[in-house]
Every structure is written in structure tokens, then in C-alpha cells.
Design a protein with these regions (language model features):
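Short beta-strand/turn micro-motifs composed of small residues
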Residues: 7, 26, 52, 99, ...
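N-terminal nucleotide-binding beta1-loop-alpha1 segment
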Residues: 1-16
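A structural signal for short hydrophobic beta-strand segments in well-ordered beta-sheet cores
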Residues: 22, 134-136, 199
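Conserved N-terminal catalytic core of the sugar/cofactor nucleotidyltransferase
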Residues: 2, 29-95
């Protein structure tokens, strides 16, 4: 299994000058360092690809032993195009991908890795306008996933997996996305084409996407509790 970490964006909402994945947590490690440590434990460093863009040198100098793909249109494209750049380097393997600003417990990864189908990590928390939301078909698989889903069952937290048999179709739909589309648009297109995507409920695990200073404060409080 390969891993793609999406770390190309500017992250202006957090109000910092460095790439958001390098944001330091309360324990002194960066968001990206925490991700890489956990991913290496389960899947190995050689299987990790990081998509970089904004101030790419800072990330590459911090983690010189990783494989990198540069999205030179990082300032005019969104996660659909960054993910496609990474997947174009991968042939015939399952792929786990995640946003580079998600802080999570290590054990959460096993839930995704061990799922036998393409899947996404979700919770059943209340959601606001900015969160990526989801709902389900009657069979329990993902139906819709976007910021505009209403009513929504919870949040899609930005950690996902595509299995080998779905990879070609998913890549094709990423190619159909507009530059400013999130990768979830390609998931919706693939679901419309018949791809089955399972929700993996991670509500019992620590998992938070860091978009704003308040998120950083909240995750710092959670980490104080030893998670």
C-alpha cells in the first residue's frame, strides 16, 4: 500500500507563514512529523509520497528521506489536482491518502488500512459550513460527500483509501475535476459510476483537521490528555 500526503496548499486561514503541515503542536512535533511517524510504523517510509507546493523547500528539508511530487500550480489548484499528481506516480497498489493538516491517533490508521474496500474516515459529530460532510445510501455506503451535503450525518475527516480495482476509475474522475475542486468531487463522480465507498466511523478516536487557530488550541488541549 502506498501513501499520499497532500501538503501543497498555502493554509492562509491559520494565519501562519510556514506550510500548515509544519505547524507545531503542544508537544513540539509538527502535524506532518506526527503523521509520518505513525504512517512509517504501519506502512514504511519508502511507501510515502508527499505532494508539496507552497514553500516546498521547508518541508523537503525537514524530511529529506521522503519521496516528493511538486504541484507547481499549487496556488491555482485544489486537492483534486494535487492528489492526481501523486496517484500518477503509483501503479497497481492500494493507496491511502490524507490531508497534511489532520492530527489523529495512531490506531485510527488501522481502521482504514484493514478495511477491505475503498473507504473514508468519517465521524458523526455536528458539522458547520466549512466541513466536508457526507450522507449514505440505504446499504450504508457513501452517497454524497462535499461541503454542501444537507442533511449530513457528520464529517469526512480527510483520511481515505482507494483499492487497486478502483484506482483507474478514480484517477480518470480526478482528471475530470476543475482546478478548484476538492478530491471529494472525484469520489462523488466515481460513486455515480458505481464505485462502492465505505464509511469508517472514527468518532471514538482523536482526529481533527487544523484550519483555524481555535482548532490548534482545541487539539493542544486534547493532546494534553495523552491522546
Amino acid at each position: 500500500m502506498k501513501v499520499v500526503i497532500l501538503a501543497a496548499g498555502i493554509g492562509s486561514r491559520l494565519g501562519i507563514s510556514d506550510p500548515k503541515p509544519l505547524t507545531k503542536l503542544k508537544n513540539g512535533e509538527s502535524i506532518l512529523q506526527r503523521q509520518i511517524t505513525y504512517l512509517c510504523e504501519y506502512l514504511g517510509m519508502n511507501n510515502i509520497i508527499v505532494i508539496v507546493g507552497y514553500k516546498k523547500e521547508l518541508i523537503m528539508e525537514s524530511f529529506p528521506n521522503l519521496v516528493y511530487v511538486y504541484n507547481n500550480f499549487y496556488d491555482t489548484t485544489n486537492t483534486s489536482k494535487s492528489l492526481l499528481a501523486g496517484l500518477n506516480k503509483i501503479e497497481e497498489e492500494d493507496v491511502l491518502w490524507l490531508n497534511g493538516d489532520v492530527v489523529f491517533e495512531k490506531e485510527l490508521l488501522l481502521q482504514i488500512i484493514q478495511c477491505p474496500q475503498s473507504c473514508m474516515a468519517v465521524n458523526i459529530n455536528s458539522v458547520g459550513e466549512e466541513e466536508i460532510k457526507y450522507n449514505l445510501f440505504e446499504d450504508g455506503s457513501i452517497k454524497d460527500v462535499s461541503k454542501s451535503v444537507n442533511p449530513a450525518l457528520g464529517e469526512a475527516v480527510g483520511i481515505n483509501k482507494i483499492i487497486i480495482s478502483d484506482l483507474h476509475q478514480f484517477k480518470a474522475n480526478l482528471g475530470k475535476c476543475h482546478n478548484q475542486d476538492y478530491f471529494e468531487k472525484a469520489l462523488e463522480l466515481s460513486i455515480q459510476d458505481g464505485m462502492n465507498v465505505l464509511p469508517v466511523d472514527i468518532s471514538d478516536f482523536l482526529c481533527m483537521e487544523i484550519d483555524f487557530i481555535d482548532d490548534l488550541r482545541e487539539i493542544s488541549n486534547q493532546l494534553k490528555l495523552g491522546k
